[in-house]
């Protein structure tokens, strides 16, 4: 995909919806390598890791003695785990796409904060992450940050793919619409109407 075609199509979707999908960006050999490393780290429980029981989200085990308490949620610190992940994060094509989306020619930096991880979805005990804006995790003066999500496997409705509310990145909801954990309160009518606009983002490996 050329820089110009990305600028014409995906960048417009990004500005309008707050996200965009670049299909078939990563070849099979490369995402296969990343998936193999991630699977190996999962099987060996290589720290740092986060378990579902640690977060207590809906659907997660209640405590460490409950069934499913050993269900993994995330492999943390992906950037430091293996050179393959670092090379992916610093890939020139990733940089070109981000520069286009952010409409900048300045140097870009990789943040190793919250989203520096490998997400997993295990059958039975994977929890539901409630509705939120990613900025809830970031304590920065400027909001010119973009999360890059690479699918290492098929992601669809059957296995808990990502869901988004298009255009919600332009909203600035009153603090009263969030709970103490900065999730949208589903009991409020104004939030219900917003959540009803949600769509699923199904991905293929390499998207």
What kind of feature is each model-predicted range?
Residues 155-207:
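Double-stranded beta-helix
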Residues 117, 133, 150-154, 166:
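Short, structured patches in soluble enzyme cores that scaffold and shape functional sites
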Residues 94, 123-125, 154-157, 170:
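Short, charged/polar surface micro-motifs in flexible loops or helix N-caps
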Residues 1-17, 23-131, 137, 177:
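Non-heme Fe(II)-dependent double-stranded beta-helix
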Residues 139-157, 202-205:
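Short, conserved beta-strand element in jelly-roll/cupin
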Residues 133-136, 149-150, 195-197:
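Glycine-rich, charged/polar anion/phosphate-binding loops
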Residues 3-4, 142, 192-193:
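Short loop/turn motifs at secondary-structure junctions and domain boundaries
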């Amino acid at each position: 995909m050329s820089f110009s075609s990305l600028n014409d199509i995906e960048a417009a979707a990004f500005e309008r919806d707050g996200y965009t999908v670049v299909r078939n960006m990563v070849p099979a050999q490369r995402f296969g390598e990343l998936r193999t490393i991630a699977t190996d780290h999962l099987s060996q429980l290589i720290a740092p890791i986060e378990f579902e029981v640690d977060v207590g989200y809906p659907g997660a085990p209640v405590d460490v003695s409950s069934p499913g308490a050993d269900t993994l949620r995330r492999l943390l610190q992906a950037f430091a785990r293996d050179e393959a992940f670092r090379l992916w994060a610093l890939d020139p094509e990733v940089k070109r796409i981000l520069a286009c989306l952010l409409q900048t020619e300045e140097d870009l930096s990789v943040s190793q904060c919250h989203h520096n991880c490998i997400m997993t979805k295990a059958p039975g005990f994977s929890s539901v992450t409630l509705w939120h804006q990613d900025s809830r995790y970031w304590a920065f003066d400027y909001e010119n940050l973009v999360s890059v999500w690479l699918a290492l496997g098929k992601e669809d409705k059957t296995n808990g793919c990502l869901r988004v509310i298009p255009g919600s990145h332009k909203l600035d909801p009153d603090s009263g619409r969030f709970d103490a954990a900065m999730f949208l309160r589903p009991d409020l009518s104004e939030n219900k109407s917003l959540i009803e606009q949600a769509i699923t983002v199904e991905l293929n490996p390499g998207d």
